[in-house]
């Protein structure tokens, strides 16, 4: 492929990532579909996907910058905890412990799950979880404040994000609601929780794929990053407003249709 084609492909993938990352519909599933449509090489895909996810993570960081400033202040200068700033560092660290531990243990095996067979099953199981969440959310007494047991439950469910196609948002938002958290709070916490994981995974992937990065790839990687960052910035606010109160049924239907499309067009 020419450099122009690579840059074009990277921009497309960045847009796909920016649109799909924040909804419970699996950005990894969509990226696999588009990398197949664009006929991209395997050695290009891994590092590019990592870079564009970093672009999406940066947009979350900027959107919640006040909370992350408090997070850093609580860690490094021991800022006094108030009702306004809450135990933000405690929430973020505790919520990410499960996926850090599990992720490091199975990191070398995750690549074997990046195929259409695995992604279809992940989409199906994630859809079932959304159905259970939608049915249960009117019956569960919601709590505005997040407690330690809920953080642990959400953190454990977040490990399902290691399965490409499941959707991190699907796992964490569902876990929050099922554990008794208001949907609006579940959505916000899901977004905030993702930032350290995205950046941590990016560093790990860059280290492990360092020799696949060449000077010729830099324009492609930068284009993908910028595309994902810009798209994410456009989408994130609208997504937050939509996801905080909406029904999960549209996402259940969408995931079901996506599973059928993958089966019919990419597995036959």
Swiss-Prot record:
<keyword id="KW-0378">Hydrolase</keyword>
<comment type="similarity">
    <text>Belongs to the UppP family.</text>
</comment>
<dbReference type="InterPro" id="IPR003824">
    <property type="entry name" value="UppP"/>
</dbReference>
<feature type="transmembrane region" description="Helical">
    <location>
        <begin position="7"/>
        <end position="27"/>
    </location>
</feature>
<dbReference type="GO" id="GO:0005886">
    <property type="term" value="C:plasma membrane"/>
</dbReference>
<dbReference type="GO" id="GO:0050380">
    <property type="term" value="F:undecaprenyl-diphosphatase activity"/>
</dbReference>
<keyword id="KW-0472">Membrane</keyword>
<dbReference type="Pfam" id="PF02673">
    <property type="entry name" value="BacA"/>
</dbReference>
<feature type="transmembrane region" description="Helical">
    <location>
        <begin position="187"/>
        <end position="207"/>
    </location>
</feature>
<dbReference type="GO" id="GO:0009252">
    <property type="term" value="P:peptidoglycan biosynthetic process"/>
</dbReference>
<feature type="transmembrane region" description="Helical">
    <location>
        <begin position="247"/>
        <end position="267"/>
    </location>
</feature>
<dbReference type="GO" id="GO:0008360">
    <property type="term" value="P:regulation of cell shape"/>
</dbReference>
<keyword id="KW-0046">Antibiotic resistance</keyword>
<feature type="transmembrane region" description="Helical">
    <location>
        <begin position="116"/>
        <end position="136"/>
    </location>
</feature>
<comment type="function">
    <text>Catalyzes the dephosphorylation of undecaprenyl diphosphate (UPP). Confers resistance to bacitracin.</text>
</comment>
<feature type="transmembrane region" description="Helical">
    <location>
        <begin position="210"/>
        <end position="230"/>
    </location>
</feature>
<feature type="transmembrane region" description="Helical">
    <location>
        <begin position="146"/>
        <end position="166"/>
    </location>
</feature>
<dbReference type="GO" id="GO:0046677">
    <property type="term" value="P:response to antibiotic"/>
</dbReference>
<feature type="transmembrane region" description="Helical">
    <location>
        <begin position="87"/>
        <end position="107"/>
    </location>
</feature>
<dbReference type="GO" id="GO:0071555">
    <property type="term" value="P:cell wall organization"/>
</dbReference>
<protein>
    <recommendedName>
        <fullName>Undecaprenyl-diphosphatase</fullName>
        <ecNumber>3.6.1.27</ecNumber>
    </recommendedName>
</protein>
<keyword id="KW-0812">Transmembrane</keyword>
<keyword id="KW-1133">Transmembrane helix</keyword>
<keyword id="KW-0133">Cell shape</keyword>
<keyword id="KW-1003">Cell membrane</keyword>
<keyword id="KW-0961">Cell wall biogenesis/degradation</keyword>
<keyword id="KW-0573">Peptidoglycan synthesis</keyword>
